[in-house]
Amino acid sequence: MIEIVDYGAGNLRSVLKGLETVGAEVRLCREPERLADATGVVFPGQGSFATASRRLVELGFADPLRAYLAEDRPFLGICLGLQLLFQTSEEAPGAEGLGALAGTNKRFAPGKKIPHMGWNSIRLKTRNGLFEGIEEGSFFYFVHSYFPVPEDKSLIAGWSDYEEEFCCAVQKGNLTAVQFHPEKSQRRGLGLLANFAKRCGSDATAA
């Protein structure tokens, strides 16, 4: 069973519906102990880095998530769920992310319309794994004001541009995390969700 981490920070129903659409066995997870037996974990998120990181601790998800990530099992982070994998964010000095990846999150340079919201194309380093079948230059839906800056640039799996180039996807083993919203990105987003479901053992098919 794929578990979607429900910590009160995201459009979870859309993610759930997207995975159900491609045939995944999936449910919302409000009990952190269920992560230990998951076939895969989806970690969405929207909103404040500080609030979300505090909620993960208060609800008991922080340490089980770290333990799950340390085992290199199928994991998909979405939007704030990508940013929280890193250690820190300029949005909330002093707040701690999960620290699964070394690096921080930076705000777009002054002068841009914030948040970066709408459809934008991505460039991929690889079209293997969760990006299999996704064409170079495909458009995905973004809503964010910050973006990740990994210390290890080899983890970057994709880039996009908003007057400056930024990392929009990372991969490390069975961990994939994206800044865009696959659940809002129509056919290509469903393709990515189907690829994740297959990695988790589901007999999934992109719609």
Q: Whereabouts are the PLM-identified features?
A:
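N-terminal beta1-alpha1 ligand-phosphate binding loop
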Residues: 2-24, 182-184
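Cysteine-nucleophile active-site neighborhood
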Residues: 47-119
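Structural signature of beta-strand start/N-cap positions in the alpha/beta core
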Residues: 25, 40, 74-76, 139
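Structural motif
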Residues: 42-44
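Acyltransferase
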Residues: 178-207
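Short acidic low-complexity segments
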Residues: 26-37
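Pocket-forming structural segment of enzyme catalytic cores
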Residues: 87-163
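Short, surface-exposed beta-strand/loop micro-motifs that present aromatic residues
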Residues: 164-171
